[in-house]
Amino acid sequence: MHVDDCAEGIIFLLENYSDLPHVNLGTGEEMSIKELTEIIKSAVGFNGTTEFDTSKPNGTPRKILDTSKINNLGWHSKINIDRGLSDTYVWYLENYQ
C-alpha cells in the first residue's frame, strides 16, 4: 500500500468511523512474491533473471487483509502497486543520485 493511500485512509477513518472493532487498510489485492518481483524489475528497468529457492519456507500462505469494511464505508486505495513502485523509484533517482 502506498503511503499516500495509507494517510488518506487514516484521515477517512478519523472523519467517518468511531466504532469497534478494528478496520483494515489495504489494497484488497493479493500478490505473489514472483509477481512483485516482476513489477519491481519493470519499475527499475532490470532485464536480468531472478531465481527463487523453493526449498525455503514461503511464510504465511495468504498475505492479504480483508478490506471490505472500509470499502463498504466508501474508501478505496487509489495508487496501484505498479504506479507506486515506479513513482518511488523515480523519487529515489531524483533525490539520491
Task: Specify the residue positions occupied by each region the protein language model found.
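C-terminal substrate-binding subdomain of Rossmann-fold SDR/epimerase-dehydratase oxidoreductases
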Residues: 1-97
